[in-house]
Amino acid sequence: MEELTERQREILSFIVKETETRGFPPTIREIGEHMDIRSTNGVNDHLKALERKGYLNRGEQQSRSLVATKRARLLLGLGARKDSGMVEIPLLGKVAAGAPLLAQENMEDSVKIDSFLLGGVNGREVFALRVKGQSMIDDGIHDGDYLFVKKTPSAQPGEIVVALIEDEATVKRYYPEGDRIRFQPANATMQPIYVSRAEFRSTMILGQVVGVYRKLQGGRTP
């Protein structure tokens, strides 16, 4: 089996750590920033090497589809991941990640997932919503993705939240600014949503996004 370079090992360790901490893997851009690699092509070269050597699986043209293999975890001294059990998460409708789409607080269905994907968050505190639109694509959140959301009425600046604005649910980054709140899309072609402090209510924030799930096209699995 081919040995990893020190750089490749550091990248692999970062991917595993971010996945376990945040509930989803880092993007190529985030890996580049962490490793001080300016070129996305440079990051891709390392990822291709990790995939070729059997330490990483990745989906085509998906920014958050990096999955470390069992071999990778053994190499990093983590051991094979134990099955932490399946949890059933209520599916509450769709999130408008573009033009807001009304999402009723009614459980449409439920999804069973490995609790590992929640990054340590108690499954009882989580609900799922399906994304509709393109406003968060630069954060690796795409139309049709399922978001795992931790129920909480508050958030830290810059966190990705699901917010209820004028009875419509939307997913944006949360930024309090002086006398207003800015809900920022991650798409340069779209404008933020502003809500004044006077109109802002704690119930506007439904929760914080802790994970993303995407079905890969063509039947490929990570």
Swiss-Prot record:
What residues are annotated to bind DNA? Answer: 28-48
> One matching Pfam family, short form?
LexA_DNA_bind
Q: How does it assemble?
A: Homodimer.
Which GO cellular component does the record give, naming just one?
A: protein-DNA complex
Keyword set includes Repressor: yes
Task: Give GO MF terms, alphabetically.
Answer: DNA-binding transcription repressor activity; serine-type endopeptidase activity; transcription cis-regulatory region binding
| Record has Repressor as a keyword | yes
Q: Which SUPFAM superfamilies match?
A: LexA/Signal peptidase, Winged helix' DNA-binding domain
Q: Report the superkingdom from the record.
A: Bacteria
**Site Cleavage: which residues?**
A97, G98
Protein name (record): LexA repressor
Q: What would be the name of the gene that encodes this protein?
A: lexA
Name the job this protein performs: Represses a number of genes involved in the response to DNA damage (SOS response), including recA and lexA. In the presence of single-stranded DNA, RecA interacts with LexA causing an autocatalytic cleavage which disrupts the DNA-binding part of LexA, leading to derepression of the SOS regulon and eventually DNA repair.
Under InterPro entries, the record lists: LexA, LexA-like, LexA/Signal_pep-like_sf, LexA_DNA-bd_dom, LexA_repressor, Peptidase_S24_LexA, Peptidase_S24_S26A/B/C, WH-like_DNA-bd_sf
Give the similarity note.
Belongs to the peptidase S24 family.
